[in-house]
Amino acid sequence: MKLLVKAPAKINLSLDVLGKRQDGYHEVKMIMTTIDLADRLELTELAEDRIEILSHNRYVPDDQRNLAYQAAKLLKEKFNVKKGVSITIEKTIPVAAGLAGGSSDAAATLRGLNKLWNLGLTIDELAELGAEIGSDVSFCVYGGTAIATGRGEKIEHIKTPPSCWVILAKPHIGVSTADVYGNLKLNRVTHPNVDKMVDVINSGDYKGICDTVGNVLEDVTFGMHPEVARIKSQMKRFGADAVLMSGSGPTVFGLVHHDSRMHRIYNGLKGFCEQVYAVRLLGERETLE
């Protein structure tokens, strides 16, 4: 039996770090929303008791480093599943980009295998399992738009922001999330107003959203990788309504309301950056139907 599952990327409209926890993680407060840039996974049930990862993308690991592999392994161990699965990952989301591509693949694997193996788990139970794999996996199980707290695994759903274009630009560099958090000095950064962002999203205020975007990690990544700051400057210069780095980077996104301006920004960035995408805010929550 085969099953096809979609794994959408996310962006952070607001990201704040409140402090370091005793378990080594950081306490965060952030707003994430899904976009219609997505990986596609094909799950094929195997009679043999093994997990196989296949992908044409050479940057996708085919072993336990892969979060989709970890998701399948977790379900097999928790629920004593003796069957195996082959997971083919068609990557569209850039790897190590601050867009939760790996986490979304893991979330899609949890949702898909819940059906394929008839486990009968609720979406809340899947999200709880997702937290054992990675901080963003719980959100990716649900999708939509949400406030994430704790280390990112506590999810509270809010309204979907008004529909708009999202221009993404990723420079040809990798950013270590651990290094970014390691260099973060909480008393020397500007903290975004996450609560205000919740208010303007819930009231459908597009201009308010554009005025309130913020990411406490931006200046840290900019200091480590000045080319990320240059992309942000270019996107602003081309006329995006709001520009922000997603996650710990290096991807920068711009919000754009008008089609003509979207095309102008997209074409301008194509001459400046190798990986550029024009997508829409998705905002739809996943279901198990």
From Swiss-Prot:
Binding site for ATP: 94-104
Biological processes, Gene Ontology terms: isopentenyl diphosphate biosynthetic process, methylerythritol 4-phosphate pathway; terpenoid biosynthetic process
Active-site residues (renumbered): 10, 136
InterPro entries hit by this protein: GHMP_kinase_C_dom, GHMP_kinase_C_sf, GHMP_kinase_N_dom, IspE, Ribosomal_Su5_D2-typ_SF, Ribsml_uS5_D2-typ_fold_subgr
Keywords from the UniProt entry: ATP-binding, Isoprene biosynthesis, Kinase, Nucleotide-binding, Transferase
Pathway info: Isoprenoid biosynthesis; isopentenyl diphosphate biosynthesis via DXP pathway; isopentenyl diphosphate from 1-deoxy-D-xylulose 5-phosphate: step 3/6
Catalytic activity: 4-CDP-2-C-methyl-D-erythritol + ATP = 4-CDP-2-C-methyl-D-erythritol 2-phosphate + ADP + H(+)
Annotated family: Belongs to the GHMP kinase family. IspE subfamily.
PANTHER family in the cross-refs: 4-DIPHOSPHOCYTIDYL-2-C-METHYL-D-ERYTHRITOL KINASE, CHLOROPLASTIC (PTHR43527:SF2)
Function as written in the Swiss-Prot or TrEMBL entry: Catalyzes the phosphorylation of the position 2 hydroxy group of 4-diphosphocytidyl-2C-methyl-D-erythritol.
Listed name of the protein: 4-diphosphocytidyl-2-C-methyl-D-erythritol kinase
Organism: Bacillus cereus (strain ATCC 14579 / DSM 31 / CCUG 7414 / JCM 2152 / NBRC 15305 / NCIMB 9373 / NCTC 2599 / NRRL B-3711)
Underlying gene: ispE
